[in-house]
Amino acid sequence: MCIRDRYKQVYSPDHPVPYAELLNEQTEPVMRELHERGVKCAIASSSYRELIDELVEIAGIADVLDYTISGHECSAFKPDPEIYLRAMEALGVEPAECLVIEDSPLGIEAGKRSGARVLALRPHEGVNLDQSRADAVIDNLTDILAAL
């Protein structure tokens, strides 16, 4: 049994993560607005597939997503751009047409290396991440709508 499976079996049941409480409240309305505007949307996350699917369900955005991919389904992790390039291919779009929303330095680098424009979502107060390589830093998910 791998460490992740053992963790889920032993630790997780007694220590659930309150994802619904941690979810950015702007996620669903912004994703719905993007969908209404005809913007193709994907989630390209380094998280495990099970967690991505769980968070998509909690956020209530499965019906407005065109594609999801886990870093564990790729041959290389961020900062390698593979995850973004595969998402772009699945959506049938070119890198220059894409806007990547990231927070981590490795994700920002992966997005830049894919050829997309990258917006960095400023982290919560007290979290210090180097987001200097992003094309711009945004404070709220609603700022995405103005960036299109």
Predicted regions and their residues:
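Asp-based, Mg2+/Mn2+-dependent phosphohydrolase catalytic module
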Residues: 32-35, 49, 53-148
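Disulfide-bonded cysteines in secreted/extracellular proteins and peptides
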Residues: 1-2, 98
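Hydrophobic beta-strand core positions in alpha/beta domains
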Residues: 42-43, 120
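Conserved phosphate-coupling serine/threonine residues in phosphotransfer and NTP-handling enzymes
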Residues: 45-47
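Metal-dependent phosphoesterase signature
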Residues: 4-28, 37
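A generic structural signal for short
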Residues: 18-20, 40-41, 72, 96
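A general lysine-centric signal
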Residues: 3, 7-8, 40, 78, ...
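Flexible, active-site-adjacent loop/turn segments at secondary-structure boundaries
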Residues: 1, 21, 75
